[in-house]
Amino acid sequence: MGALVNSEQRQDVQESVNKLIAAGCEVLLGGEADLSAAGAFFPPTLLYCSQPDETPAVHAIEAFGPVATLMPYRDRQHALTLARAGGGSLAGTLVTASGELAREFILGAARAHGRIQILNEASSAESTGHGSPLPQLVHGGPGRAGGGEELGGLRSVKHYMQRTAVQGSPTMLATIGQQWVRGAQVNEDRIHPFRKYFEEIQPGDSLLTPRRTLTEADIVNFACLSGDHFYAHMDKIAAAESIFGERVVHGYFLISAAAGLFVDAGVRPVIANYGMENLRFIEPVKPGDTIQVRLTCKRKTVKHQRSADEKAPAWWNGRWRFSISTSRRWRCIPF
């Protein structure tokens, strides 16, 4: 509602409004600026087009200012047709309390909009407004909207960066990227990876652990300790009728047992594990199976200090790949 960029833009908005009026739109509010007044102000303007299907100008002419045009629609499908008629839009807003209607509108109108805001009672109080630039969202639209993704939001940064594909063997790619990738060579030595300091550990340093055979007693003990008495672990008859055919080991026990195989006890440079990514249980492990763990350093990075105290210890962040295999040579848990 504030001033436009300059008087030339104000003149351009006035000319666009005049064209819309000439095409058959009715002025409900505003419509004419005082071109002799100081400042590039244009009055809030509301137009009404009673025949939107027969008035192509209302879809083709964009008065880039505080101007809006009301258009009636017969039903939902007609509303979608009108929403797409502009041939590309930076942003659109749908005001509705119906999730079903919102889904239908998104699926039908998304291809013609860079962004669609769904406004209802829950979101209205914190609404950023129609088309406000936000770093997490695309800022730009298709077709006649002219693109613009390179002008706003986090995605815009990538438009100013070159993407180059690098092709080579896994070991070569790991060397170039300073990050171990699956299939690359590993380095096994007599020093446990957890005993190495930041300067010593390298991507690709790996440990293949001893083996451990899992028993029904392990399943029962873990169930009693954790409280997880799920039938696939504890009910022999019900488990036999499942897709597994028999009882299976708890997935979370496998993770714990794996830690018992690869962790090096005692005071070491490694201090804690703060999470696991891409954990998948892709094969069942059953009583009598023997597991073995492969631990590989993927990459290492220096962790920024939270304290300005020069005496604060330096921390580093290591990313590791774990793969649990069974005696049947299945990779049952990669993460």
From Swiss-Prot:
Feature: compositional bias, Gly residues: 140-151
Top-level taxon: Bacteria
Coiled coil: none
Domain MaoC-like: 203-306
SUPFAM superfamilies: ALDH-like, Thioesterase/thiol ester dehydrase-isomerase
Residue segments, region Disordered: 123-152
Gene3D superfamilies assigned to the protein according to its UniProt record, in alphabetical order: Aldehyde Dehydrogenase, Chain A, domain 2 (3.40.309.10), Hotdog Thioesterase (3.10.129.10)
Pfam families: Aldedh, MaoC_dehydratas
GO molecular function annotations of the record: oxidoreductase activity, acting on the aldehyde or oxo group of donors, NAD or NADP as acceptor
Family that this chain belongs to: Belongs to the aldehyde dehydrogenase family.
Protein known as: Protein MaoC
Source organism of this protein record: Klebsiella aerogenes
Phylogenetic lineage: Bacteria, Pseudomonadati, Pseudomonadota, Gammaproteobacteria, Enterobacterales
